[in-house]
Amino acid sequence: MARIAGVDIPRDKRIEVSLTYIYGVGLTRSQAILAKTGVNPDIRVKDLEDGDLQKLRGALENYTVEGDLRRQEGMALKRLQDIGCLRGRRHRMSLPVRGQRTRTNARTRRGARKTVAGKKK
């Protein structure tokens, strides 16, 4: 397996698809990187030359990927929670953040049902 940006990318897949195994690189960004470096997107990772791998590593240094990106996202969420805005509070309470209804739906975000005992007569 070739190692790019600290990630072992699969050898038998096309380089265009293999780059998407890196957190922060989707198909569009992968295609842009390959176009910029001049690497054929249809070539398999195992057939890449060392020079091509070095070009790809150099091109990926211009983007925020993997641990740095995860850290940035975590800090953005923490900032929202620290300033006490509605979005931060909703994140903290594990509720939908973007205005969706919660009376009936939002099961994924809220988790499994917690049964509350009924009132006795």
UniProtKB/Swiss-Prot annotation:
One GO MF term: rRNA binding
Region span, Disordered: 97-121
Coiled coil regions in record: none
GO CC annotation: cytosol; small ribosomal subunit
Pfam families the record matches: Ribosomal_S13 (PF00416)
TM spans (from-to): none
Subunit structure: Part of the 30S ribosomal subunit. Forms a loose heterodimer with protein S19. Forms two bridges to the 50S subunit in the 70S ribosome.
Physiological role: Located at the top of the head of the 30S subunit, it contacts several helices of the 16S rRNA. In the 70S ribosome it contacts the 23S rRNA (bridge B1a) and protein L5 of the 50S subunit (bridge B1b), connecting the 2 subunits; these bridges are implicated in subunit movement. Contacts the tRNAs in the A and P-sites.
Annotated family: Belongs to the universal ribosomal protein uS13 family.
Protein name according to UniProt: Small ribosomal subunit protein uS13
Source species taxonomy: Bacteria, Bacillati, Cyanobacteriota, Cyanophyceae, Synechococcales
